[in-house]
A protein has these predicted regions:
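Active-site-proximal alpha-helix that buttresses catalytic centers in soluble enzyme cores
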Residues: 1-266
């Protein structure tokens, strides 16, 4: 049975345009795993926010993109090519929303003759708004006779931790405090998946592997509103360190294999 690897990221607009950003944001915010509200609330809210935020989102996307191609599309496709070259197994890049959707990647893999599909979400730590949403979408497309294997997480995988430590060795300064900044989620969602515990485990393993006395966990991209989000925020902690006289800090973001727009811009 022929095998195929499918990498799945959160998603990206298909192109650098306000229209593509609007479509992407509307699809993203319409997902009940992202906005846990009734459809009659979630759908119109997604349309309003997408219309208002499209231009600002495009401006942020342009900050991190190169050659007119959205950064996440380029990064995930490049990773797929490298994995295919390393393993000899055809590898496809897919996104939960926007460019190159999951259904399209599965169809391309089927057309190549694959019937054994190995899915790897680009999220080392499991959260309902990322891993769970991707898993639900993936298994909606399974056909009889096909094998679907899905990696839930890899927050404590030895190869992943070693890769993080190697990157720190290239760019980090052990004389400075180190912050591991993860994408925040509402506290109410964290309890369903153990996401924050997985993030803290990653940070602890990174500290051990890189020979650091400590790695502090901070959070970014809190959306505010009535929900309580995981904290402290990365910006607040950096401000606190600066006020205490610290003149430099290492920041590592181990939460997305290919990044996401908010993480990279912030």
């Amino acid at each position: 049975m022929k095998k195929a690897f499918i990498l799945v990221n959160t998603g990206s607009p298909a192109e650098l345009s306000a229209a593509a950003c609007k479509t992407f944001l509307r699809e993203f915010l319409s997902d009940p795993d992202v906005v846990p509200a009734p459809f009659f609330v979630r759908y119109p809210l997604a349309r309003v926010i997408a219309s208002k935020r499209a231009e600002a989102y495009l401006a942020n996307l342009k900050k991190i993109s190169r050659g007119g191609v959205p950064r996440l599309v380029e990064a995930c496709a490049g990773l797929a090519r490298k994995i295919a070259a390393m393993t000899g197994t055809e590898t496809f890049a897919a996104h939960r929303y926007g460019a190159f959707p999951v259904a399209e990647a599965i169809r391309a893999a089927r057309d190549s003759g694959a019937r054994d599909f190995r899915f790897l979400p680009m999220f080392p730590q499991s959260a309902s708004s990322t891993t769970f949403s991707v898993k639900r979408e993936v298994f909606a497309h399974r056909r009889e006779g096909e094998v679907f294997r899905f990696r839930e997480n890899y927050f404590d995988d030895g190869a992943y931790i070693s890769a993080l430590a190697a990157l720190f060795g290239r760019f980090g300064d052990r004389s400075l405090p180190t912050l591991a900044s993860f994408h925040s989620v509402p506290v109410s969602q964290d309890g369903k998946t153990g996401y924050s515990a997985q993030c803290r485990k990653t940070a602890g393993l990174l500290a051990s592997a890189a020979g650091l006395a400590d790695v502090s966990v901070v959070w970014q991209s809190q959306m505010g509103g009535p929900l309580k989000w995981l904290g402290p925020s990365a910006s607040a902690e950096i401000g606190r360190l600066s006020a205490s006289g610290v003149d430099g800090v290492n920041v590592v973001c181990p939460g997305f294999a290919c990044g996401c727009t908010e993480t990279l811009v912030e």
